[in-house]
């Protein structure tokens, strides 16, 4: 039994929750050397009432050119939710008659509020601030995380949070925290850090990890997510690690709800198995969850209906011991954090898919010792997310939190209200947590309805049906003038309806294409190109961008974790995003895709494919798009 397992057993024998493990042996050399910023340490003294601050290099807030920050924002009821469980009706009310109306939010110049966690004003939010985040927003995120999202984390004291500039920033800081730079030819191979992930992975992670010299180590995955047992599964990779190839990986990256690109939702059972192996081999789990609220409870049922299959057996989401207070949040598959007895989970959240990517705002949830290190990293890198965004999001989710009707905040609201219609005046407030959850439910509803529509169209076009006169040998009466027809069904692609997220992950059956393995003459000097999987897959992507199809999808090779995956499997897949196009274009885009694929299978001239491949840039990607192309790949790297 290794040290980590024995620690855990001893602690779990007691009744009280165990303290999280000390994971400082995983810190990078840079992290170990990071000291608190002397200036940021002094910030707490800035808050002393009446203090005249001559210490900080702060510009005077009177000279900020913004007197208020204001926005017309959606009401939480703008979108109609979908049911939390198949066959139910939505728990929240559907959209009200004025759901399209906006609410008006105002961040005033100076709020008359002594509690920094309630004071939302231009004077503080546009000033230098705390590295952990703007106090009102940080305290709301902390409360939402600890009370509503991760109310059951099994270690003593529960997790803490720190704000980031989005999940990309969160992962970059995680690498800074845990990974020492490794350079080939300079450092010893046995020191090379490794990152465990699925064979198909959100591309940006690779772009972030590889320049640090990190070796990306893939773990076999199946339709239910990362495999634990069997050859190539997690246990096999870690137990049989060959140290001559690098250090045994101490870090895992995964997306468990609506995986990008595969759309898988990892079950709690699988999470428990993965967690146990990570605990045994002392691996830190980075759970990146931008799609957390987009879990589609109807997907399995609708998939069976669309395919004429028997209804699936109803699955129940394991319940937390303590309710979040919101049936919608309770209905989501629990996070790795709910199993995290050791404190080895670092979870990345973002406002990118729930508010807007341009916010560049998110947060990290982890055990407090790790959060403290992240704060130190924030201090000397981004310092804090943008004040404009922190101010507007604070106002949006916290609403009119300052008490009394004569506060500057209220006065600013009243002044504005005079100019607006009575209906808008009535809607003059922020959302609060219940409004935030209602917003999330509505988003899930809109995306779930889109995925159902798109997948039905994709199902209908998945097989090419052709008819031809049956061969003479198979006819019962060869002399009859009525030739019976032979029907051929050619599978073009197969897919599983996504259980969450924003993507459909299609497996193409290019081996059924008439030009599969055909020789394609290139230049007189070079040998002919063979139209294999990678060539046909690339040609199909370009073909779809031409008239009359005009759709852009992302190919699996873009998400392949390494060259081996790219060569063996990457070309078999295409990722289709059903989120980016306007509602009215979802059916059109799916229909054009289906038609484009079907017509591609009718191409029998190698010259057509050769020309399509000539359109690709040196990187193998489409360089210029025709006007009017609907993007189902959007953005390719996201
Ligand atoms: C899995 C995953 N992580 C992170 C991101 C980016 O998040 P952020 O905008 O917060 O950096 C994306 C965006 O597509 C994503 O799919």
Sequence positions of predicted segments:
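Conserved core of the PLP fold type I
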Residues: 78-282, 286, 292-339, 534-535, ...
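Internal, charge-rich low-complexity segments
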Residues: 70-95, 223-233, 292-316, 393-418, ...
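PLP-dependent enzyme catalytic core of the Aspartate aminotransferase-like
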Residues: 135, 520, 546-552, 557-638
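Short, solvent-exposed loop/turn segments at secondary-structure junctions
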Residues: 57-61, 168-169, 201-203, 224, ...
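Conserved core segment of the aminotransferase class I/II
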Residues: 96, 107-110, 117, 140, ...
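Conserved glycine-rich beta-strand-loop-beta hairpin in the small C-terminal domain of fold type I
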Residues: 424-455, 459, 468-511, 518-525
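N-terminal "arm"/small-domain region of PLP-dependent enzymes with the aminotransferase-like
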Residues: 2-133, 544
């Amino acid at each position: 039994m290794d040290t980590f397992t024995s620690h855990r057993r001893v602690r779990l024998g007691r009744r009280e929750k165990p303290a999280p493990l000390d994971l400082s042996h995983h810190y990078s050399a840079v992290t170990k050397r990071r000291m608190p910023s002397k200036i940021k340490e002094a910030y707490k003294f800035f808050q002393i009432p009446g203090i005249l601050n001559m210490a900080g290099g702060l510009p005077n807030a009177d000279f900020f050119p913004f007197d208020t920050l204001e926005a017309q924002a959606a009401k939480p009821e703008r979108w109609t939710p979908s049911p939390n469980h198949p066959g139910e009706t939505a728990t929240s009310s559907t959209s009200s008659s004025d759901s399209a109306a906006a609410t008006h939010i105002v961040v005033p110049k100076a709020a008359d509020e002594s509690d920094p966690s309630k004071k939302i004003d231009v004077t503080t939010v546009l000033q230098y601030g705390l590295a952990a985040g703007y106090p009102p927003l940080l305290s709301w995120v902390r409360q939402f995380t600890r009370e509503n999202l991760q109310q059951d984390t099994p270690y003593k004291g529960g997790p803490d949070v720190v704000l980031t500039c989005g999940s990309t920033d969160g992962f970059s800081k995680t690498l800074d925290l845990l990974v020492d730079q490794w350079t080939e030819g300079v450092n010893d191979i046995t020191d090379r850090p490794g990152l465990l992930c699925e064979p198909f992975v959100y591309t940006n992670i690779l772009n972030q990890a590889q320049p640090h010299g990190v070796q990306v180590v893939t773990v076999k995955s199946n339709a239910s997510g990362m495999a634990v047992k069997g050859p190539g599964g997690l246990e096999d990779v870690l137990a049989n690690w060959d140290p001559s190839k690098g250090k045994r990986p101490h870090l895992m990256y995964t997306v468990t709800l609506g995986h990008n690109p595969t759309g898988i939702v990892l079950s709690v059972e699988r999470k428990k198995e993965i967690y146990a192996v990570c605990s045994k081999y002392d691996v830190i789990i980075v759970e990146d969850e931008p799609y957390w609220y987009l879990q589609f409870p109807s997907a399995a049922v609708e998939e069976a209906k669309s395919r004429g299959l028997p209804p699936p057996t109803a699955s129940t989401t394991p319940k937390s011991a303590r309710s979040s207070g919101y049936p919608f949040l309770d209905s989501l598959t629990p996070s790795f954090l709910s199993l995290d007895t050791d404190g080895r989970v670092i979870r990345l959240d973002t406002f990118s898919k729930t508010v807007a990517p341009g916010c560049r705002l998110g947060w990290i949830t982890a055990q407090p010792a790790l959060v403290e290190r992240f704060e130190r990293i924030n201090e000397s890198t981004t310092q804090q997310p943008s004040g404009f965004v922190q101010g507007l999001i604070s106002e949006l989710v916290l609403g009119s939190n300052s008490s009394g009707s004569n506060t500057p905040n209220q006065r600013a609201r009243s002044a504005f209200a005079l100019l607006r219609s009575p209906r808008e005046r009535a809607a003059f407030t922020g959302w609060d947590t219940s409004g935030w959850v209602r917003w999330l439910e509505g988003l899930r509803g809109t995306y779930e309805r889109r995925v159902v529509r798109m997948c039905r169209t994709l199902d209908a076009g998945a097989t090419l049906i052709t008819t031809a006169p049956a061969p003479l040998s198979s006819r019962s009466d060869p002399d009859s003038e009525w030739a019976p027809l032979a029907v051929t069904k050619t599978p073009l692609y197969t897919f599983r309806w996504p259980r969450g997220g924003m993507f459909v992950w299609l497996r193409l059956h290019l081996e059924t294409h008439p030009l599969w393995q055909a020789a394609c003459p290139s230049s007189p000097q070079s040998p002919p190109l063979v139209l294999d999987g990678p060539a046909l897959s690339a040609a199909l992507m370009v073909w779809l961008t031409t008239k009359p199809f005009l759709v852009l999808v992302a190919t699996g090779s873009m998400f392949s974790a390494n060259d081996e995956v790219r060569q063996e499997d990457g070309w078999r897949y295409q990722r289709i995003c059903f989120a980016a196009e306007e509602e009215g274009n979802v059916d059109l885009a799916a229909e054009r895709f289906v038609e484009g694929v079907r017509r591609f299978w009718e191409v029998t001239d190698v010259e057509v494919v050769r020309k399509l491949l000539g359109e690709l840039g040196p990187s193998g990607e489409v360089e210029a798009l025709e006007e009017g192309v609907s993007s189902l790949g959007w953005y390719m790297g996201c």
